[in-house]
Amino acid sequence: MYAIIATGGKQYKVAEGDIIKVEKLGVEAGATVSFDQVLVLNNGQVVVGNPTVAGASVSATVVEEGKNKKVIVYRYKRKSGYHKKNGHRQSYTKVKIDKINA
């Protein structure tokens, strides 16, 4: 059994027991979260939502929150001497999928 959920502007294919990184949710570790935007549900039979599957949700437990590795953004224009260096670390929340409610 698997489901495709949408959170943080991205889509994730999840099954029970999976651990995934999603965009920061702002919830402390150990808390339970529910994802209600289930786009596709497969429990032996594929159900595609329009745009979401009615009555379906995915419950998960927050494992940790953190930041990804730093990404360096470097802008450069030749001949003029212009250059600019920026760094960015995106925050994430790691969750463990507990149950897919159909």
From Swiss-Prot:
Job of this protein: This protein binds to 23S rRNA in the presence of protein L20.
Protein family: Belongs to the bacterial ribosomal protein bL21 family.
Gene Ontology terms: biological process: translation
Name of the gene encoding the protein in the UniProt record: rplU
Entry protein name: Large ribosomal subunit protein bL21
GO terms of molecular function: rRNA binding; structural constituent of ribosome
GO cellular component: cytoplasm; ribonucleoprotein complex; ribosome
The entry's keywords: Ribonucleoprotein, Ribosomal protein, RNA-binding, rRNA-binding
Coiled coil: none
Assembly and binders: Part of the 50S ribosomal subunit. Contacts protein L20.
Any Pfam family hit: Ribosomal_L21p
